Amino acid sequence: MSTGRRVFVLRIGHRPVRDHRVTTHVGLVARAFGADGIFLEESVEESVIRTLRNVVENWGGDFKVLTTRDPRETVANWKKNGGIVVHLTMYGENISEELINLISGQGKDILVVVGGEKVPRWLFEEADFNVAIGNQPHSEVAALAVFLDRLFKGEELRREFPGAKLSIIPSKRGKIVVRRE
C-alpha cells in the first residue's frame, strides 16, 4: 500500500512439510492485506515460494518474496535501517486503536513478525512492540490479517493490484473472474 512507508512480514519458525500450508497462507494474507513483501526462512520449501510468486504474477502487484538465512539478522538489519519491529503474539500488549496509532504514527518502515509454535525469547526482547491479537491461542494467519487490517484501517481491501492478469468482479452469487492480457 502506498502509505509512504514499507510494511514487510517475517515468518519465523517454519517447520518443513508440516507448515507448508500455513506459511503459504501467511504470504497470501500479507499480500492481500497490504504488505509490500515477506521474508521466509531458507528452510521453506521452494513450492511455497513458487506459489506466492505465481500469485503475484497472475493477480498483480509488486509483492516481494524474499528468503533469509538468519531471521535475527533480518530483524537487526531492519532496525539498523530505521524501521520498527512488531511481533504478533498472544502474550503482548492488547491491540487497541491507541497502540495501532502509536505504531503507525512513528512513520517508519514496519517489519511484522509472525511465528510458529515456539518463538525464540530474543524476539520478545528485540521487538519494538509485542502485540497481542487476543490472549488466547490462535492462528498466526488470523493475527496477521487482523493486525494489517487495523494498521491500514480497511483501505487495503479496496486496493487495486497493478499488472493483474486475473481479477474478481464482486457478485452476490457466483464466481466472476476476469482475465486481462
UniProtKB/Swiss-Prot annotation:
Keywords: Cytoplasm, Methyltransferase, S-adenosyl-L-methionine, Transferase, tRNA processing. One of its GO terms (molecular function) is tRNA (cytidine(56)-2'-O)-methyltransferase activity. It catalyses: cytidine(56) in tRNA + S-adenosyl-L-methionine = 2'-O-methylcytidine(56) in tRNA + S-adenosyl-L-homocysteine + H(+). S-adenosyl-L-methionine binds at L88, G115, G116, E117, K118, V119, I133, G134, N135, Q136, P137, H138, S139, E140. Homodimer. It is an enzyme of class 2 (transferase). CDD domains: aTrm56-like. Disulfide bonds: none annotated. Belongs to the aTrm56 family. This is tRNA (cytidine(56)-2'-O)-methyltransferase. Specifically catalyzes the AdoMet-dependent 2'-O-ribose methylation of cytidine at position 56 in tRNAs. It comes from Thermofilum pendens (strain DSM 2475 / Hrk 5). Its EC number is 2.1.1.206. One of its GO terms (cellular component) is cytoplasm. GO terms for biological process: tRNA nucleoside ribose methylation. Pfam families: Trm56 (PF01994). It is found in: Cytoplasm.
